[in-house]
Amino acid sequence: MGYRKLGRTSDQRKAMLRDLATSLIISERIETTEARAKEVRSVVEKLITLGKKGDLASRRNAAKTLRNVEILNEDETTQTALQKLFGEIAERYTERQGGYTRILKQGPRRGDGAESVIIELV
């Protein structure tokens, strides 16, 4: 399966995709360029599939990709992005067989004309 280089070295590209995937899991909606969104879509789809499995090996594989970021909930409790993935997001998509994300085009970005999109969880 091919991938986009995104104008970066492999370690920079992996770090950027980890950050984007973690941000998408936390906020469930991010704005980025079209190329980055298409690339992070495959990462997030695989993470959600791991979350649906729910076993220890899947949790460890997902922990390799996601950043260890704590989220403050409305009820003043904290959880990590990994806990959110295996808790509420995995429950939401138990009946769905893939296609967990949606990409909405916004048009060109003002500064450099790059195609701007919103990627969100369905």
From Swiss-Prot:
GO biological process: translation
Disulfide bonds: none
InterPro entries in the record: Ribosomal_bL17, Ribosomal_bL17_CS, Ribosomal_bL17_sf
Protein keywords: Ribonucleoprotein, Ribosomal protein
One GO CC annotation: cytosolic large ribosomal subunit
Stretches assigned to coiled coil: none
Molecular-function annotations in GO: structural constituent of ribosome
Pfam families: Ribosomal_L17
NCBIfam families (UniProt xref): L17
Family of this protein: Belongs to the bacterial ribosomal protein bL17 family.
Oligomeric form and interacting partners: Part of the 50S ribosomal subunit. Contacts protein L32.
Name of protein: Large ribosomal subunit protein bL17
Provenance organism: Staphylococcus aureus (strain NCTC 8325 / PS 47)
